[in-house]
A protein has these predicted regions:
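Sec-exported extracytoplasmic/periplasmic mature domains
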Residues: 2-6, 26-30, 67, 81, ...
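Stable alpha-helical elements in mature extracytoplasmic
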Residues: 1, 17-21, 29, 33, ...
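Bilobed "Venus flytrap"/periplasmic-binding protein-like clamshell domains
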Residues: 1-5, 9, 38, 58-114
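Hydrophobic residues within well-ordered alpha-helices
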Residues: 25-26, 76, 115-122, 161, ...
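Extended ligand-binding regions for polar small-molecule ligands
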Residues: 1-4, 66-70, 74, 79-80, ...
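Short, charged, surface-exposed secondary-structure boundary motifs
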Residues: 43-47, 92-93, 116-118, 137-139, ...
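Terminal targeting/leader modules
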Residues: 33-36, 41, 53, 110-113, ...
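Acidic, polar ligand-binding/catalytic clefts
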Residues: 6-75, 131-155
Length: 210
């Protein structure tokens, strides 16, 4: 909003889920998807979504109750594992347990419900999602110390903004807004001190400042 309109308030936020995020992008309800959406070959090449610079590398993991006394997801034989049925998370979890020949009971959570809520109700022994989400959710639990994030990282999740194919000007704006934020952070420039760099003697910073 600041880059396009010069106004940080000129923005509207839409709440999306694992299914509606893509339909909203296709039908123009949203101009850019900034949810935790993994950059994959299928989404990019076959489904024609343009993934712009990765802003965060996450990895999928698991959380379980400390009282179970386990220290690894590989110890969860016969456990009930809940996960969202949409997105890459379900496939990653299935692949992990198949690879390690671990029998488990899948509890597939619908789009109208959250895995963490099903887990907290005691309907599953463990749930899996991106580790940043696990850490954030755990902080919101009534007794976070009673839950443990297991050490396994079962995937690599490159996350960043997504736009529709076909609008080169818009994708260029989003792409270079992200790059400018990267470069500015590397040089120690932020919204509070940017004016002090206007007459900087470094030619590289001079070019960056325009």
């Amino acid at each position: 909003a600041a880059a396009v309109f010069g106004d940080v308030e000129a923005i509207e936020y839409e709440i999306v889920d694992g299914v509606s995020r893509f339909t909203h992008l296709i039908d123009g309800t949203i101009d850019m998807l900034s949810a935790a959406t993994t950059y994959t070959f299928t989404r990019n090449v076959l489904k024609k979504f343009e993934f712009l610079p990765t802003t965060y590398y996450d990895g999928q993991g698991f959380i379980t109750k400390r009282t179970l006394g386990v220290s690894s997801a590989k110890q969860m034989h016969g456990a009930k594992i809940c996960f969202s049925g949409s997105g890459t998370a379900a496939k990653n979890i299935k692949d992990f347990f198949e690879l390690h020949e671990i029998k488990y009971i899948p509890i597939v959570v619908g789009v109208d419900e959250k895995s963490k809520d099903v887990y907290l109700r005691g309907e599953c022994d463990m749930y899996g999602t991106d580790r940043s989400g696990l850490a954030s959710n755990r902080l919101g639990f009534n007794n976070p110390e009673l839950h443990i994030i297991l050490p396994e990282i079962i995937s690599k999740e490159p996350l960043g903004p997504v736009v529709k194919y076909g609008d080169q000007k818009w994708s260029d704006i989003v792409r270079w807004t992200v790059y400018v934020l990267f470069i500015g952070e590397e040089m120690g420039i932020n919204s509070k001190n940017i004016d002090t760099f206007k007459n900087h003697k470094d030619p590289y910073i001079q070019r960056f400042m325009g």
